[in-house]
Amino acid sequence: MVELRQFSDLPIALSGISRIADPSPPPPVVAIRRRFKGGGNTRRIVFSVPLIFAFPFPTGTPKDVLVGIAAVFDGHSGSEASEMASQLLLDYFALHIYFLLDATFSKELTGKLPNSLMHLYDLDSQRFQDSLPLNFHLDILKEALLRAIYDIDATFTKEASTRKLDSGSTATIALIADGQLLVASIGDSKALLCSERYETPEEAKATLIKLYRERKRNQDSSPSRFSDLKLEHRTGLMRFIAKELTKDHHPDREDEMLRVKAAGGYVTKWAGVPRVNGQLAVSRSIGDLTYRSYGVISAPEVMDWQPLVANDSYLVVSSDGIFEKLEVQDACDRLWEVKNQTSFGAGVPSYCSISLADCLVNTAFEKGSMDNMAAVVVPLKSNLDWESQPKEQSVGPSGFKMKNTYALPCEFLSSQPNLFRMG
């Protein structure tokens, strides 16, 4: 039996169960934010949801594993693909975890588990638990996510074929569990880490000069303030360094272009952007049925589980519009400025005091980005004790247990009213 606990203030439909959490407000500390700009006939949908799943461990008792999910779906040629993907992800992900665990213990396999688990099937229940590898739950989470993505695309493909839909969507999904991070991406939405790194006085000086010049262009700093900064950081500087976790699936990428050409498609630029058959700007997507016969695929590229370390400070998941005018390092520089606003507050725009995601979206907007934009910023250094928070339980006919709590503070802002509630 798999136990699913839901942290949020949003209704989630799971195998016929619809559960709305207690309406009392979450704690005042906000850990996750996201923000939208832009309009048109496409939708940039983001969400971040913490869940708890109970997994079997060698101790013989289930262990609660907190799983954070942050996702961005950036639609194009219509909103149908991004809407469906966001609606189905949590349900499909949870159900595949249930199916994989149930298949493992019942031995009534309806599919294949990861190869690393196959040799465990012939063991009895106790020996099975004793033989579980330490990363058993991570294997299950990864496989469930990949199967969920596959099923989302299959479901939308059927719907699009029936309704003659042309829309498509990117998908960038990050999982955090047991201090490790996994990212699956389709298209050109990005995920990146901002991690602290010590800079020598010489490196720090170069950083401060760069920031000072940037602020001077924006008329939000003064020479006297820069002198103060040099004194404050004359012994060195802790700075955020960006690490990109995804690779854009653009058709001019060598491996992507080879696949497109092998399928009979071609890549050419239109308005300065490489496109499949002169039209589609990504070489992987959910939907986009017209281009499937020309090498456009929905298979995600996966950054497998990697440990988060003490200096990893923020995870950013965003649509590509954020980086139309910004580099990934610019995003981490802005977050670093906000974090150090005791020293740098004079140069941090007022909108950065609202939320970190607002800060990135509005920074990109002021830099001249013309695209729709969406972002999720997840602080990675929160020490909240979720076990100490009050919980309530509801058991549905499917056997799923869903527990709701505000142990991890989240604020949901979404353009999708049937999945998320503004408040």
Curated annotation (Swiss-Prot):
EC id: 3.1.3.16
Keyword set includes Hydrolase: yes
InterPro entries xref list: PP2C (IPR015655), PPM-type-like_dom_sf (IPR036457), PPM-type_phosphatase-like_dom (IPR001932)
Catalyzed reaction equations: O-phospho-L-seryl-[protein] + H2O = L-seryl-[protein] + phosphate; O-phospho-L-threonyl-[protein] + H2O = L-threonyl-[protein] + phosphate
Single GO MF descriptor: metal ion binding
Keyword DNA repair among UniProt keywords: no
A Pfam entry, by short name: PP2C
SMART domains registered for this protein in UniProt: PP2Cc
Listed cofactors: Mg(2+); Mn(2+)
Lineage top rank: taxon: Eukaryota
Domain PPM-type phosphatase: 52-380
Protein name: Putative protein phosphatase 2C 50
